[in-house]
Curated annotation (Swiss-Prot):
GO molecular-function term, one example from the UniProt record: olfactory receptor activity
InterPro entries associated with the record: GPCR_Rhodpsn (IPR000276), GPCR_Rhodpsn_7TM (IPR017452), Olfact_rcpt (IPR000725), OR51/52/56-like (IPR050402)
Domain of life: Eukaryota
Name by which UniProt lists this protein: Olfactory receptor 52B4
Keyword terms, alphabetized: Cell membrane, Disulfide bond, G-protein coupled receptor, Glycoprotein, Membrane, Olfaction, Receptor, Sensory transduction, Transducer, Transmembrane, Transmembrane helix
Amino acid sequence: MPTVNHSGTSHTVFHLLGIPGLQDQHMWISIPFFISYVTALLGNSLLIFIILTKRSLHEPMYLFLCMLAGADIVLSTCTIPQALAIFWFRAGDISLDRCITQLFFIHSTFISESGILLVMAFDHYIAICYPLRYTTILTNALIKKICVTVSLRSYGTIFPIIFLLKRLTFCQNNIIPHTFCEHIGLAKYACNDIRINIWYGFSILMSTVVLDVVLIFISYMLILHAVFHMPSPDACHKALNTFGSHVCIIILFYGSGIFTILTQRFGRHIPPCIHIPLANVCILAPPMLNPIIYGIKTKQIQEQVVQFLFIKQK
């Protein structure tokens, strides 16, 4: 039950309100949420299944794509089922520990996806700029080390947030006008000084996501320089088509992420009935569209999907 605490004791249960001002429309709003989530789940699961079962796709590019699809499933599953529970059953009550667990996986998976996109940019750089050395540079041993590094970075940087939140006393309103928990959104309900939470969150953002964006930009500048110096137009076109799908996913992922961050920091005058749905769309859009983009833009995956869905049935 949502309450305002006057005793000074810390709340252990919070209430996720859903979309403030649109509670009477929650059932209708849940329909596109549910369809998008099922699409993301099926699309990414199919992508993972095809990549893992087809030996012709056991290449670094597709293995990194498999990692991205797995992260997409985790990110959407961390948020959308909770939102649907609120929309359908008004099940908005969430314990503090569960709230912290949810935001831990949301933030760490976001950083993990950013790291995977950086690795994919590095993969494209080697494939286009050093094609003859591609297999000797991106060995299976290096790929395993990259996977471990991406995981350690994402979970390692977010892990201290658990203790930064557990130290706080939540003696203010326990009603959260959102469909899921996030770090600063929860911390602002504390009676303590949360400047360390704010600065730590900012430092994580700068040292991971912003750094990844800079390195991705540099890698693609080098790629474009190499592409436009290729001897034949056909080779240039083929190279551009190779990483076109990756560029689309980068724009989709970072564009939606930047919008969400800017809205949280500077969009205080944006009504919650607009901000909350857009925040969910920004989390759900990349997982839903990534398999579609790669299915359309990548010929090898397109062929394997068609073979799996249609030829196998015959």
